[in-house]
């Protein structure tokens, strides 16, 4: 406590809604503090922190606020490295659009995929917000449940108007789904306070939330050392695809599979997969690329975790080397 107070004083003595030196990752309950049925995202600690960020310059904070945010993110890095060490599981990322509704077939496919990967011993990590990111954490959360129960959970979310049109209503349904199927299995979320009003989803027990989106994105891709699945998304997903491709090309953190969900989207509608495949052939990592329409086909790239596989240290060492942590 004394160290926290001294650090706060050194950063201007300003009262902030977040701890400058968090000693662990956030939980869903931490960031939902203040919420009650009928309330929207602004009532939560998560929403209050975003409002604070917006009021203090957003992406261009003043010096003391910027120092406080960067210090916070450093401590989150350390907490994340510790969590990855304790998890002792290989990490697979699932990326995709935040606007994908639960009624979209790809949302249900990602739920099924994340559940299967969790059953196989992987730790699923996503961006922590809604859409495909929510589907990834939801699927992991429901890994021990039946297909029927997963269908019921997805249908409950699909029957709501959607977060964009009814924040309070959507949150209430999502909280209800979480409570109905508690306790859920573990997964990880790595979100950011950059995107306006974007809430955490309700299904990730461990949350490494950052102020800096560039630090967050780099870490999110780097820790997924067992591979990344890319569902359809927009510009943010496209950025993640090419950033991950660059990491594979330069062997920044070794090389890992890049698997694309939805052949029509990636091969025909956007042409992203053929373009990336040509570059991957030139740069020597084409064997890591694949595209599929169904979870069963994607799972062929990610076998059941071999007995005794020590995946504890790889994501942690990658993060620590990248951040120069000790």
Model-derived features with residue positions:
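Short acidic, glycine/serine/threonine-rich loops at helix termini
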Residues: 136-139, 200, 240-243, 270-273
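Glycine-rich beta-alpha loop segments
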Residues: 1-172
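C-terminal functional extensions of proteins
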Residues: 220-222, 255-326
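Short, charged/polar "capping" segments at the starts of alpha-helices
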Residues: 5-8, 102, 197, 265-271
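Short beta-strand segments
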Residues: 93-97, 127, 189-192, 231-232, ...
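Acidic/glycine-enriched connector segments
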Residues: 131-230
């Amino acid at each position: 406590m004394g160290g926290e107070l001294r650090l706060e004083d050194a950063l201007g003595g300003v009262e902030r809604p977040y701890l400058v030196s968090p000693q662990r990752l956030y939980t869903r309950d931490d960031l939902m503090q203040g919420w009650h049925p009928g309330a929207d995202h602004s009532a939560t600690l998560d929403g209050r922190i975003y409002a604070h960020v917006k009021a203090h310059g957003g992406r261009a904070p003043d010096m003391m606020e910027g120092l406080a945010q960067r210090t916070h993110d450093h401590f989150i890095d350390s907490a994340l490295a510790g969590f990855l060490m304790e998890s002792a599981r290989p990490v697979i990322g699932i990326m995709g659009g935040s606007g994908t509704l639960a009624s979209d077939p790809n949302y249900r496919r990602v739920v099924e995929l994340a559940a299967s990967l969790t059953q196989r011993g992987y730790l699923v990590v996503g961006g922590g917000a809604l859409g495909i990111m929510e589907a990834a954490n939801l699927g992991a959360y429901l890994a021990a449940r039946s297909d029927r129960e997963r269908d019921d959970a997805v249908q409950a979310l699909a029957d709501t108007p959607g977060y964009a049109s009814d924040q309070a209503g959507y949150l209430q349904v999502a909280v209800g789904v979480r409570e109905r199927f508690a306790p859920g299995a573990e997964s990880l979320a790595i979100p950011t306070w950059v995107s306006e009003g974007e809430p955490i989803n309700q299904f990730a027990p461990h949350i490494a939330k950052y102020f800096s989106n560039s630090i967050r994105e780099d870490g999110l891709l780097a820790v997924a050392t067992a591979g990344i699945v890319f569902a359809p998304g927009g510009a943010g997903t496209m950025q993640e695809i090419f950033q991950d491709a660059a990491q594979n090309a330069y062997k920044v953190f070794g090389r890992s599979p890049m698997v694309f969900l939805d052949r029509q989207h990636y091969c025909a509608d956007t042409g992203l997969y053929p373009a990336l495949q040509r570059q991957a052939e030139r740069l020597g990592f084409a064997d890591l690329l694949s595209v599929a329409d169904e979870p069963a086909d994607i799972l062929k790239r990610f076998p059941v975790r071999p007995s005794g596989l020590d995946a504890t240290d790889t994501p942690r060492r990658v993060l620590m080397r990248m951040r120069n942590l000790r």
